Curated annotation (Swiss-Prot):
Belongs to the ARTD/PARP family. It catalyses: L-aspartyl-[protein] + NAD(+) = 4-O-(ADP-D-ribosyl)-L-aspartyl-[protein] + nicotinamide; L-lysyl-[protein] + NAD(+) = N(6)-(ADP-D-ribosyl)-L-lysyl-[protein] + nicotinamide + H(+); L-glutamyl-[protein] + NAD(+) = 5-O-(ADP-D-ribosyl)-L-glutamyl-[protein] + nicotinamide. The PARP alpha-helical domain (also named HD region) is regulatory, it packs against the catalytic domain. It is a single-pass type IV membrane protein. It is an enzyme of class 2 (transferase). This is Protein mono-ADP-ribosyltransferase PARP16. GO terms for cellular component: endoplasmic reticulum; endoplasmic reticulum membrane; endoplasmic reticulum tubular network; nuclear envelope. PROSITE patterns: PARP_CATALYTIC. Auto-mono-ADP-ribosylated. The record marks 193 as: Nicotinamide-stacking aromate. It comes from the Eukaryota. Residues 77-280 form the PARP catalytic domain. The lineage of its organism: Eukaryota, Metazoa, Chordata, Craniata, Vertebrata. It comes from Rattus norvegicus (Rat). Intracellular mono-ADP-ribosyltransferase that plays a role in different processes, such as protein translation and unfolded protein response (UPR), through the mono-ADP-ribosylation of proteins involved in those processes. Acts as an inhibitor of protein translation by catalyzing mono-ADP-ribosylation of ribosomal subunits, such as RPL14 and RPS6, thereby inhibiting polysome assembly and mRNA loading. Mono-ADP-ribosylation of ribosomal subunits is promoted by NMNAT2.
Length: 322
């Protein structure tokens, strides 16, 4: 078992270190959340004792994980528990994640519709591929229907669960236009719901990340949106509103998916918050202590005026001019 976990973890990291790093970052973000009992799902069974989740032990072991490049270069003496934990984080029976070229972002923009306003290019881009039977089941549900591509924004801590369990309509808290999973064709809108959050301290991607999901959505009547009737310019009212909607029709650029089987995450856009440069830190310190700086400069000015008006200084100055 020890060799199996070590070999599996090494193989995953060697194949795509950035994708492996992303999984560790999403796991760490969920673990550090105050909602960790609900967002850290799945949870490693080896840390569940007597029907209780040992978060403290898991936090301690996660805190000891080196960055993945260092882990690859480490000797075989590396703690078994480290390899077991990394192997668990990187394992999945239903999907695999791999890093994609930034040029793929242009393809995503075409799939979701060209943006009307400039949008930030992600620092990292990842694609998710699903194994059978999950992949076959999705295409069986799709049948001959088209696919819609749209963005879903959420807090970083939620993505560990989103990746492994999918997006669930009943868990969505944004319900102004009815119960469902909310998506948008506008990346700038999705980013509002994806604030930067604390990830993994040893991440190669960065310690503070923002993540947006690009979803594949089956064009089905259970996907509510502003769409026109077939062969008509008239809005299809049956798809524009959800039953018991408090806000009326679903607004343009939004999609509300009311059936979990109709969508899945296909890409992940990751934005890394850059660390401020030293000069920026110094400027920030000056801004924070502006009153003290102003008073110091004022006192220095008074001292200069006092010295220049003294008789000793006048005598010295007159001798210099001779």
């Amino acid at each position: 078992m020890q060799l199996s976990n070590r070999a599996a973890a090494r193989e995953s990291v060697s194949r795509d270190v950035l994708a492996a790093d992303l999984r560790c970052s999403l796991f760490a973000s969920a673990l550090q959340s105050y909602k960790r009992d609900s967002v850290l799902r799945p949870f490693p069974a080896s840390y569940a004792r007597h029907d209780c989740k040992d978060f403290e032990a898991l936090l301690a072991d996660t805190g000891r994980l080196p960055n993945l490049k260092e882990l690859l270069q480490s000797s075989r003496d590396t703690d078994k528990q480290t390899w077991d934990l990394v192997s668990w984080i990187l394992s999945s029976k239903i999907l695999t994640i791999h890093s994609a070229e930034k040029a793929e972002f242009e393809k995503i923009q075409q799939l979701t519709g060209a943006p009307h306003t400039p949008v930030p290019i992600p620092d990292f881009l990842f694609e998710i591929e699903y194994f059978d039977p999950a992949n076959a089941r999705f295409y069986e549900t799709k049948g001959g229907r088209d696919l819609i591509y749209a963005f879903h924004g959420s807090r970083l801590e939620n993505f560990h669960s989103i990746i492994h369990n999918g997006l669930h309509c009943h868990l969505n808290k944004t319900s102004l236009f009815g119960e469902g999973t909310y998506l948008t064709s506008d990346l700038s809108l999705a980013l509002i719901y994806s604030p930067h959050g604390r990830g993994w301290q040893h991440s190669l991607l960065g310690q503070t990340l923002s993540c947006v999901a690009v979803c594949e959505v089956i064009d089905h009547p259970d996907v509510k949106c502003q769409t026109k009737k077939k062969d008509s310019k008239e809005i299809d009212r049956s798809r524009a509103r959800i039953k018991h909607s408090e806000g009326g029709d679903v607004p343009p650029k939004y999609f509300v998916v009311t059936n979990n089987q109709l969508l899945r995450v296909k890409y992940l856009l990751v934005y890394s918050q850059k660390q401020p440069k030293r000069a920026s830190s110094q400027l920030s310190w000056l801004c924070s202590h502006w009153f003290m700086v102003a008073m110091s400069l004022y006192l220095l000015l008074l001292l200069i005026v006092s010295v220049t008006n003294s008789s000793a200084f006048q005598h010295f100055w007159n001798r210099l001019k001779r």
